[in-house]
Amino acid sequence: MKAWVLILMIALGASGCSKDLKEPPLTLLPGAEPSAKSRNDLGIEHYQAGRYLDALLHFNQANFADPTSGETHFNLGLAYLQEGNKEKAIKNFRKARKLARGNPGILESSIVNELLQKNQG
């Protein structure tokens, strides 16, 4: 029995199980580019369902449609963090902060602030 528990723990650890991030992805602000908004909304649906690679696909498409959106960079950061790619998460969180336009969801994010502080923001 102990062997099965150990095998299960190793398998879950190797599969990159999601972290319980306390902050959800952000919706785009009113007036956002329509295709960016629809792609971002799809990304949020996938993210909330735990399908982080699918979420990344849609968040990247939203970012392509509007690269000036701090929210899409924030969402990319969350999804990359869930996938275990801390380097890309940090890159996107830095960009999100630069493009935040006063959005408290980005500027006051404990995830962003803690991660960037640890990695010299």
Predicted regions and their residues:
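Canonical tetratricopeptide repeat
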Residues: D41, N75, S109-S110
